[in-house]
C-alpha cells in the first residue's frame, strides 16, 4: 500500500423539491426553510439541521453536480472509489436527481447526475490522453465498464441481461454477492458492458432504465418499485508520475527508472444508487403486488437505516454492523464505512403533508454524516509493491547518506543524535557557494585579460612585420588567430593538469581500496603492443636528435663565413629567420599542446568512466546487501504469516533477485564495452603518434631547406623535442597505471560471477519453497472442501428433518381445519333444523318477512358470539400450547438448582437481600425506561394521527372551496355579480377559508409538538441501558430475565384478550351492518314496487338513489373504467344492492364487477347473501355470471354428464368446486382475470328469467310448501369425490385443462389422458346457442385431440396444422374433419408451424430447431435447421425421447417463423435477430438485425417480384421494417423504425393492404400506415390482458383480436371502433389463423375453435344489449 488509508466522512446533501401543483391546489403549506449562505435547513419553526450542502427549491441540476459530484469523478482518475445515492420518501425527486428515469424529451438543463457524470468522465479521458501526447509520454489506456443492477423484492436483477424473462421477476436470480480479501464487494453473474464512448454509455443507461420496474401509486404517477444501482468501472494504465529531483539525484535506481517509463494500473468504481422511496401503504393506496413491493422496499430501507445508525452512532461503532440483513446494504457495504468517497443526497418534500417523512429523512441524513470511510487508492499489487519498495529505498538511502556525511551518529549507549559536524558542514557549504561566486567573477576577469594579452601580442607581431615591410592584413589576422589559439590551449592545459591531479588522487584512493578485490593482474596483448610502439617512438626521437646536432655543426660553419662577407645582410636575414622560427615554434608548440590536451581529456574521460564503473559496482553491492537483509527479514516474517502471504513474499523476492541478476549481467556487458573502448582509444593514440612523426619529418625537411641555421634555433628545437619526450613518458606511465586498473577490474569479474551463481541458487530455492507452499495450500483447500461437504450433508439432513416436521405440522393443521369445517356444518344444520320446526304458509311468510329480518339478528348474534366463543376457545388452547415451552423453560433449571439450595440456606439472608435490592432497583430503572419509550412512541403516534386527520380535513375543505369557487364563477357568468347566491357562496367560502387557516395553525402546532417530543426523546436518554446490563451480575441477570419473561407473557396475554374482544366486536358490527343492509334492501324493493304507481314516491326514491351514488368509496380501486357506476334509469334496480353494500362497507376492493340484483333468499337471510357473494368472488374460473348456490346445485344434480351439451357444461360448476359453500376459496388465481358482466338491463332480464324458473321448481318440489322462501338452503347431497389430486384440482380452477375433462366427475384423469393420446383427434360440430347471433362470428366446429395447450395454428382451404405443448404437430383434414397425421419427436413445445403450398413442406419450430417435413407420402423429417444457421439431413432431434428444456450453446430460442408469399424464403426469429433461409438450397443467407430484445413475432409481405417486406416485433417494445431483395446476403439493417413504440413487448402483427396492425403486452392495439410509415390510430386498453393474436376476417374489412383472458374482439378497420366481443375460450388465446372462408383460434384449453363470419352490415351491430347477453351466456 502507498500508506495508511485516509479517513473520509460521508458527505450529505439535502435537496428540497418544489411543491407539486396538486399540493398547491390542496392547500399544502411549506414547512422547510433554508438559511441563506449557510448549509442549514429549518424544519417547522425552529428545528435546525446542518449538512455539507443544502439545495433549496430553486436549485438546478448543474449546481448540484458541480458542488457535489464533480470532485468525485476527478478522484476516480486517481484510483478512488465513489458512491452517490439518493435517499428519501417516494415522490421526493430521487430518480429525477440521479437521472435514471431517462426521459427522451428531456432538456439539457434537466439532465441528471449520471448523464452529467458520464459526459464529464469521457471528456476527462480525452483531455488526459491529449496532455500525455503533448508531453511526449505514452497515452494512458482507459477501460470503462458499466453494470446496471435492480434490487426488486430482495432479488438482484441484471437490467443489461436481455435473455432474462421480464415477467419472471419474482423468480430467484442467479446473481451472487461476494467480498474480496480487502473488504471490497463484487457480484458474480452480472452482465458487464464495455463502453468506449459517451453515446454507448447513454445507450446502456437507456436500455437499463427501460427495463426497470416502475408503477403508479396514489403519491407518484411513475414510482420506482425497486432500488437501482448503476456502476461504472474505470481501469487506467498510465505512466508513473515523476518523483522529486532532489531524491532522484542520489538514487541511481530511481534515475534509471526515470529513463524508461514505468506504468501503474489504477482502478475505480463509481456507484450511482437510486433508492426506491420509503412509503406508507395508507398514503400510496398500494394493494397486491404494489403492496408487496412497498413492503420489500421498506424492509431494505429499514436495514439501510440500521446500518447508518450502527455506523453513525459513536456509542455503537464497536458493535456489529448488520450489513447482511438486506441485499441492499450488502451491495453498499464498501460505500458505507468502507473504501469509498460517499455522498448521500437526501431528497425531501417541503409540504407539511409529508412532515413526518421529511423529519425521518433529515434525522437519518444527519446521522449518516458521522460515518467514517477508509479511502485508499486502488492500485495493482505490483505498482503498490514497487512504490513501497522505492519509497523504502529512498528513505534508507537518505538515512545511509546522513550516516556517511556524519549528520547522524550513534553514541556508546546506542542513542541516535545529530552530529555537530553537520552544522559545520552547512557553514562550509555556504562558504563554498560564496567562493564559487568569487571564482566565477575571477574567471570573467581572466577571460578579459586573456583577450587583452592576445590583442597586445598580436599588435606587437604586426608591428614587427610592418617594420620589416612584409606585413599585410592576412598575415596579421593569421597571427592573431594563432596567438588566440595558443592562449586558449594554455588555459586548457592548466585545466587539464588540475583535472589530472584530481584524478591521480582518486586513483590513489582506488588503489588503496584494491586489496578488497584479491587476484592476479594480467596484461592484454593490446597493452603490450602499445608499449613496444612507445619504445620505438623514443628510439626514433633519439636518432632525430643526433641528426639535428650534426646539421647544427654544419650551420655554425656556414654562418661564420656569411658573417664575414656581409654583416648587414646577415642581420636582416637573421631577423627574418627569427620571425620564421618563432612562428614555426609557436605552431609546433600549439600542435603539441593540443595533442597533449586531447590525450589528457581522453584519459580523464577514461578515468571518470572507471570511477563511474566503481560507483556502480559499489551501489550494486549495497543493493545486494540490502536484498540479503530484506531476505532475512522476509524469512522471519514468513514464519508468522499464513501461506498466502508467504507465497506473495517469495514471489516478490524472486522478482527482486532476478532483477539483481539482470543488473549484474548488464554490468558485465558494460565492462566488456569499456574494454573495447579502451583498446579503441589506444589505437587512436597510436595514430596520433604517427601523425606527430609525420609532422616532425615535415619540420625537419623545412629545416633542411634553409641554408643557414643558428645554434639557438637548434637548441630550441632540441629542448622542444625533449619536452615532447617527457610528455610521452608521462603518458606512458599513465597508460600503464590504467592498464593495471583494467587488470584489477578483470579480476573482480570472477567475484561477480560467484555472486551471480549464489543469487541464482537462492532463486531456485525460493521457487522450490513456492511450490511446496502451493502444495500445502492445495491440501488445506482440499481439507476445507471436505469439511464443507460434510457440513453441507449435515445441513441437508437437518433440512430434511425440518421438512418432515413441517409436513406433520401441516397435516395436523389440515386435520384441525377439517374438524372445524365439520363442526361448522353441523352447527349450520342444527340451526336450519330449528328454523324448520314451525312451517308457515306463503301468505304468512310474506307478512312476517320484516319481523323475521329484524328478529333474526339476535339469533345471528348468538351464532356469531358462539363462533367467537369457539374461536376464543381455540385461541386459548393455542395460547396454552404456546405457553408450554415457557413453563418448561422455567422448570428446567429446577433440578440443577435443587442441589445448591442447601448451600444458599447455610448462608445468611443478608447477601440475598442485598442482591435482590440492587436487582430490584435495576429492574425498576429498566421498566421505567421501557414504559417511557412506549409512552413517547404512543404520544408521537397519536400526534401523527391527529396531524393526518387535520390534513384530511384540510384537503376536504380545500376541495369544497374549489367547488364553490367554480360554482361562483358559473353563477357570475350566467347572472352577474348581483345574484344573491353569489353573496351566500362568498360567505361560505370565507368560513371555509377561516376553517382552513385554523386547521393550518393546528397542523403547525402539531408539528411543533412532534419536534419537541423528538428533542425530548434525544435529550432524555440519560439512562444508558447497555451500561446497566453490562454491570449486572449473573444472579441479577437471571432476576431481570425472569421479570422480563413475566412481563412479556402478561403483555402478550393482554394483547390476545384485546384482540379477541376486538374480533367479537367486529363480528357484531358486521352482523349489524348486514342486518341493516338487508332491511334497507327490503325497504327499497317495497318502495320501488309502489313507486311505479306513485310518482311522488318515485321522485323521492330517485333522490335517495342519487344520494347513494354520491357516497365516496375509499376501498374501491379506480384503475379501470369498469368501476364507474352506471346511473341510468334502467340500471337503478341492478345497482341498488351494490350501493347499499357500499354504504355498509361491504364492497371488496378486488372485485371489480358490480354485484347482481339480490334474490329473495338473500333479501330475507343475510347468510345466504354472504355465501352467494363469496361464491361470486371466490371462483373466478366459472365461465359466466354465477347462478345462486341452490340453482347451481340443482343444475349439478339434475343434469347428466353424458347428455349435457357444451353450452350446459359451461354453465355448470367445475368438479373442483367444494361441496360446501363455506369452504369456497375467496382468492382467485393470479393468472385469471375478471370476466366482464353484461349491462344492467341484460342482467335484470336474465335474473327475472331465473326467478321464474326457480318459482316453477319450487311449485313442483316434494314438500308442497314454500319452506324454501323461509329457510336457508340445506346442505347439498353428498356427491362422489373427484378422483383428481390436489394439483389437478388447482389446475382445473386455473382453467388450464379442458372443460370436457373437468365435467367428467366419475372418470379418471390419467386414464382419459392416455386414451386421448392414443386415439386420433377429431373435429366436432360446436352446438349453437341462443343469443350468439348478435356476435359477428359464429363458432361452428371445435378440434380436439391435443393433450396440452395449443400454441400455434396454420391452415389452407383443405388442411389445418396445429402445434402444441405436447411436443406434436397435428395435421387435420378440413373436409373429413379428422386428424391425418401427427408430427412428433420435438424436444419441447411446438411454438410455430407453417405450410408451403408450392412445395407441400411443413415447417415446425421447437426450441432452437426448425424441422422440415415432407407430408406427401408420409410424415418424414427431411431436414433440420438450427438458429445458428446449421443444416442437418434428416431428424436431428429424434434421439430426444423426453422433454429437453436446455438449449445447446451457441443457439437461441426460435420464437416464430414466416414464409414469403412465393415460398422461396423462410424467416426465423431467433434471439434479437431474424435469420434468412433460401429454401431452394436450404442455406442461411444472412440475418436481419437491429432489435435490442428478443424478436417475438414477424410477418412477411411482398412489395414486388423478388422483394420481400418483413415486419418484426420485439420485447424491446419496437416494431421494425426490413426490405429484402432477392439474393441479399449478410446482415440487413432495418429501413424504418415505427415510432412511438408500445409500452411493452409486441405479441402479434398482421398486414392488411397498406395497413399494419400490432398487438402488445400493454393491452393495446395500434394501426400503422405502411406507405407513410406513420401511426394512424391506437386503442390503449383494447383488452384487459395481453393481446396475443391478431387476424383479419375473410371477405370483410374487420380485424379480429384475441387476448390472454380468452376474449375475442372484432374491430372495424376503417374507424378502428369495436364491433363486438365475446368469450372465445376459457383460457388464453395463443394464435389466430384464417383461410378463405373460416377463422381458427388456438388456446390453452387444448382445442382449436373454427369460426365463420356472419353477414355484417358495415361492421356494426345495433343491439349491444343482446351482445352483452351473448357474452354472459357464453
From Swiss-Prot:
Changing residue 1164 to A: Does not bind to KANK1 or KANK2. Changing residue 954 to W: In CFEOM1; enhances plus-end-directed motor activity due to loss of autoinhibition; gain of function. GO terms for molecular function: ankyrin repeat binding; ATP binding; ATP hydrolysis activity; microtubule binding; microtubule motor activity; plus-end-directed microtubule motor activity. The modification N-acetylmethionine is found at residue 1. The modification Phosphothreonine is found at residue 1664. WD repeats lie at residues 1345-1382, 1385-1423, 1449-1487, 1490-1532, 1541-1578, 1582-1621, 1624-1661. Its main location: cytoplasm. Keywords: Acetylation, ATP-binding, Cell projection, Coiled coil, Cytoplasm, Cytoskeleton, Disease variant, Microtubule, Motor protein, Nucleotide-binding, Phosphoprotein, Repeat, WD repeat. GO terms for biological process: anterograde axonal transport; cortical microtubule organization; microtubule-based movement; regulation of axon guidance; regulation of microtubule depolymerization; regulation of microtubule polymerization. PROSITE patterns: KINESIN_MOTOR_1, KINESIN_MOTOR_2, WD_REPEATS_1, WD_REPEATS_2, WD_REPEATS_REGION. Residues 851-865, 1128-1138, 1170-1179, 1196-1205, 1288-1297 have a biased composition (Polar residues). Changing residue 1154 to A: Very weak binding affinity for KANK1 and KANK2. Residues 556-641, 779-804, 841-881, 1116-1138, 1170-1318 are annotated as: Disordered. SMART domains: KISc, WD40. Residues 598-637 have a biased composition (Acidic residues). Changing residue 356 to T: In CFEOM1; prevents the interaction between the motor domain and the coiled-coil domain expected to cause loss of autoinhibition and gain of function. The coiled coil region interacts with the kinesin motor domain leading to autoinhibition of the motor. Part of a cortical microtubule stabilization complex (CMSC) composed of KANK1, PPFIA1, PPFIBP1, ERC1/ELKS, PHLDB2/LL5beta, CLASPs, KIF21A and possibly additional interactors; within CMSCs KANK1 and PHLDB2/LL5beta seem to be the core components for recruiting microtubule-binding proteins KIF21A and CLASPs, whereas PPFIA1, PPFIBP1 and ERC1/ELKS serve as scaffolds for protein clustering. Interacts (via residues 1146-1167) with KANK1 (via ankyrin repeats 1-5) and KANK2 (via ankyrin repeats 1-5). It is linked to Fibrosis of extraocular muscles, congenital, 1: A congenital ocular motility disorder marked by restrictive ophthalmoplegia affecting extraocular muscles innervated by the oculomotor and/or trochlear nerves. It is clinically characterized by anchoring of the eyes in downward gaze, ptosis, and backward tilt of the head. Patients affected by congenital fibrosis of extraocular muscles type 1 show an absence of the superior division of the oculomotor nerve (cranial nerve III) and corresponding oculomotor subnuclei. Belongs to the TRAFAC class myosin-kinesin ATPase superfamily. Kinesin family. This is Kinesin-like protein KIF21A. It comes from Homo sapiens (Human). The gene is KIF21A.
